Regions:
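Boundary/entry segment of secreted carbohydrate-active catalytic domains
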Residues: 1-17, 25, 202-206, 266
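Substrate-binding cleft of secreted/luminal carbohydrate-active enzymes
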Residues: 227-245, 249-250, 257-307
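Catalytic domains of carbohydrate-active enzymes, especially glycoside hydrolases
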Residues: 17-43, 151-157, 227-230, 282-288
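Active-site-adjacent "subsite" loops/lids of carbohydrate-active enzymes
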Residues: 2-5, 10-12, 79, 84-148, ...
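Aromatic-lined carbohydrate-recognition surfaces of secreted/lumenal glycan-active proteins
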Residues: 76-88, 146, 159-166, 176-215, ...
Length: 307
């Protein structure tokens, strides 16, 4: 069974943190880490297209060190890029960099019914600022960013997250429903051309019907067309029976595509997580991936030791 971790960008800001990540992975037989290097339209790597992430110290290149450190210990590094989700701020502040696409190209941003993009549309369900999936220039920029990453860095794979609309209320035409898949389709061509053999993966809503109807994420279509090599349905539930139901349904929707069951690593609930890893395997998943790596709760990674 494949064992993998999602690693959020705030856990890779120093060499020491990355070295600790690799040590934690190797001691538990974890050979794949999916690491967030494009979180909010910014770069945790050296980029000519997007600004350096705010708060990233000095001239440190996290992705370069990840690739080197992973190669030294046999851990495969997958670069994780948020696709349409490009900014969020609890205070409603804009990015500091004038080069950030939110500042450079506000015309690319998704709006609903004329509402300003910084206003919380949908109350507590509002996630942040998205680019409009229908906007061809925005899609082109995003694909150029992803291609830059896989060209410059010897990553094992590229991982899409937020490859969807925030809510179906933003969509009202057939073009809306095709826009997300248009990016995934073009991405498959470009990333595979830039780095032959690359593993293209996506984090997806686990129920394919809800994914289609609520956020216009038609991931079973991507699987059938071989646009992705690996799917990670995010079955984030404490109810293990519900996790089993969701992963079984996901497996049936894409029976020929490699799949890792996405599980929430709830703090202090190691027994629950161990049961859910077992459930993912029973549902037919080739592996499990935990959200998310946290050195403060590294004991949760021990669930993989017995898997």
């Amino acid at each position: 069974m494949d064992k993998a971790l999602w690693v959020v960008r705030d856990k890779i800001t120093t060499k020491g943190a990355i070295d600790d990540l690799m040590a934690d992975a190797t001691t538990r037989g974890i050979h794949d880490v999916v690491v967030q290097v494009r979180g909010r339209g910014d770069a945790y790597y050296t980029s000519s297209l997007e600004p350096r992430a705010e708060g990233l110290p000095g001239d440190f290149d996290p992705l370069a060190h990840l690739v080197r450190a992973g190669a030294a210990v046999g851990v495969r590094v997958h670069a994780w890029g948020n696709v349409f989700f490009v900014w969020s701020s609890p205070e409603g502040a804009l990015p500091k960099s004038a080069k950030h696409l939110v500042n450079r190209h506000p015309e690319w941003l998704l709006r609903s019914g004329g509402v300003k993009y910084l206003d919380p549309v949908g109350g507590s369900d509002w996630e942040g600022i998205y680019t409009d999936p229908r906007n061809a220039e925005a899609r082109e920029h995003t694909l150029a960013v992803f291609t830059e990453i896989v060209t410059r860095y010897r990553v094992e794979g590229f991982h899409y997250d937020y490859v969807r609309y925030p809510q179906a209320t933003y969509a009202d035409s057939p073009e809306d429903h095709a826009a997300v898949t248009a990016l995934v389709s073009e991405g498959a061509k470009r990333l595979r051309a830039a780095r032959p053999g690359i593993v293209i993966s996506a984090a997806v809503f686990p129920d394919p019907d809800l994914a289609r109807d609520r956020v216009l994420q038609r991931w079973p279509d991507w699987a059938r067309a071989s646009l992705v090599d690996l799917l990670c349905p995010m079955a984030y539930r404490r109810d293990t029976a519900e996790v089993a139901r969701l992963l079984t349904k996901a497996r049936a929707a894409a029976p020929k595509t490699r799949m890792w069951g996405g599980l929430m690593a709830y703090a202090s609930e190691r027994a629950l997580l161990r049961d859910q890893v077992r459930v993912a395997e029973q549902a037919g998943c080739e592996g499990a991936i935990l959200f998310a790596y946290d050195p403060a709760h590294r004991d949760l990674l021990d669930v993989f030791s017995a898997a």
